[in-house]
Amino acid sequence: MFYSIKELVEQAELDFQGNVAELMITTEFELTGREREEVLRLMERNLEVMKASVELGLSEKKSRSGLTGGDAAKLDHYIKKGKTLSDFTVLSAARNAIAVNEHNAKMGLVCATPTAGSAGCLPAVLTAAIQKLGLTHEQQLDFLFAAGAFGLVIANNASISGAEGGCQAEVGSASAMSAAALTLAAGGTPYQASQAIAFVIKNMLGLICDPVAGLVEVPCVKRNAMGASFAFIAADMALAGIESKIPVDEVIDAMYQVGSSLPTAFRETAEGGLAATPTGRRLQKEIFGE
């Protein structure tokens, strides 16, 4: 078992030849008593749900509230025109993140990674990485186990709850997990993966949770797209050999401190931020008649 990113990196290097996925599978057995076959089967199911949520989310159908829906399809059409400013892989990830979260807003089945509100980042980065890197099925599962390993530390030492730590804890954690797994999938070391986490979280520090009308739609859906995009930049920076001046575990500690200091208006209560704007209040009244 590991209790910090430093310990995770050391154990992966010393005991698992740098294979973070194998470390996580072993840790899962230690925590739950599940045998390897069951652990793999459950992760297979997660992978299936993630891929399906990307495909189903490309629909142009609106959510019941009318706040979201159709943006993933718009971005898909834009990508297919071949005149995008952003790299195809990164923009594909952004599209897929929007797709998953629009699917979630329409009561579709998603895999909380680590939460439903931040469920778009990891599937988006993974599916884009499959295209870019040609990941095998086994490598796709390794991607998810590795993301889970790093996410476990973040959850235990900071938070993955918007109600507790703001959106930095939800989309921030999801983006960081994705960046770490992506770094490994591209041939990086566990240490480089840890640096990718630091880059993402430092960029996300202080991000509030301010859902309009209290629904996980605005600004949540688009924040997932940005989080997926950040993951690619962070992974590239780490693979280039860039290092965080602040150790990653201290960055995670700072994330916890910042989240704990946020006023309740900025922690999923829909009482501040974008939710409290005139338009945010108007939309809430239109939806709930309040």
What residue spans do the PLM features occupy?
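Glycine- and acidic-residue-rich phosphate-binding/metal-coordinating active-site segment common to enzymes
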Residues: L144, F150-A163, C167-M177, L182
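Glycine- and small hydrophobic-enriched segments that form the cores of compact globular domains
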Residues: L85, A112-A119, Q131, L135-T136, ...
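Conserved phosphate/anionic-ligand binding catalytic regions in large, soluble enzymes, centered on
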Residues: M107-V125, A169-A174
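Acidic-glycine-rich active-site phosphate/pyrophosphate-binding loop
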Residues: D87-N104, Q139-A158, K202-P211, A270, ...
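Generic N-terminal targeting/processing segments that precede catalytic cores or assembly contacts
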Residues: M1-G108, I130-K132, G241, V248-E290
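Functionally critical mobile loop/hinge segments
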Residues: L184-E290
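Alpha-helical support elements that line or immediately flank enzyme active sites
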Residues: P123-G134, L182-G187
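Well-ordered alpha-helical segments within folded domains of soluble proteins
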Residues: S118-T127, S175-A180, A228-A234
